[in-house]
Amino acid sequence: MLFEQIAANKRKTVFIILGFFIFVLMVGAAIGIIVWNNYLNGLILAAVIGAFYILIMVMSSSSVVMAMNHAKEVTSKEQAPVLWDTVESMAMVAGIPMPKVYIVEDPSPNAFATGISPEKGAVAVTRGLLNKLERYELEGVIAHEISHIRNYDIRLSTIAIALVAVIAILSDIAMRMIFWGSITGGRNSRKSDNNNGGGAQAIIYIVALIFVILAPIIATAIQFALSRNREYLADASAVELTRNPDGLIQALQKISGDSKKMEEVSASSESIYFSSPLKSKKNKPGLFDSHPPISSRIERLENM
């Protein structure tokens, strides 16, 4: 059951990522139709901006994420021996280099990982998590975060965030060009085409315009669907490492029962946390939820 869940989650992730790239190209094609009356120009624009933006995002240092979330590095075992030992042992079991260790001075129990590869990984936990969890529960949470690093989830989420940003940029470019009348020549040629080809060209233009307007919303929903799926995969992978689903289940129950929201959370970092720092109590995932409900995560763990 465990390995079936892992395999199913990986397959779903592949489909979501492929769909995401296709969606970006579709947005580019729609913008090409709107701006130049030529979808190929839009495809090229989307590909160039997409590749450039992804490269910038992937090359960004994980230290930026840590700074945004006020995380301070633990540089020696003596500073936090239990945390250090737990990260070290879970990394060893996972077969990856030991990530850097950070602590966020916040009373709400939570954790996150960053780093685009296992060699550049880092794990951060809040002070509230260290104070609230027993060691075997902490192992479950750390195994979850180590799994994110081992499964290259941070790289995937970085690419997804970049693609959402690219779609927003492309949509904004199209809207500005339309608003400021920068495509007047294109409109004139389109009118000529409409006289020759009836209303088909106008219908294509309107459909493309609606698609571009809705694209950022759809892209955000796809990004969050990917995020929710990777959380399920990290849970299953954590059990693979610890061989103890009860530790992770108990940790999730304790975190769910804690009503304290994190005091300072970067909005762009919400999706990387172990559980939603906004403390959502919903039992069913919404389209724009970065995390699946804790009750759903516990149910899956209990069925392993």
Swiss-Prot record:
Its cofactor is Zn(2+). One of its GO terms (biological process) is proteolysis. GO terms for molecular function: metalloendopeptidase activity; zinc ion binding. Keywords: Cell membrane, Hydrolase, Membrane, Metal-binding, Metalloprotease, Protease, Transmembrane, Transmembrane helix, Zinc. Its main location: membrane. It comes from the Bacteria. It is found in: Cell membrane. Its EC number is 3.4.24.-. The active site is at 145. InterPro entries: HtpX_protease (IPR050083), Pept_M48_protease_HtpX (IPR022919), Peptidase_M48 (IPR001915). Gene3D superfamilies: Metalloproteases ('zincins'), catalytic domain (3.30.2010.10). Zn(2+) binds at residues 144, 148, 231. The chain crosses the membrane at residues 14-34, 39-59, 159-179, 202-222. One of its GO terms (cellular component) is plasma membrane. Pfam families: Peptidase_M48. Binds 1 zinc ion per subunit. It is a multi-pass membrane protein. Belongs to the peptidase M48B family. PANTHER family: PROTEASE HTPX. NCBIfam families: PRK04897.1. This is Protease HtpX homolog. It comes from Listeria monocytogenes serotype 4a (strain HCC23).
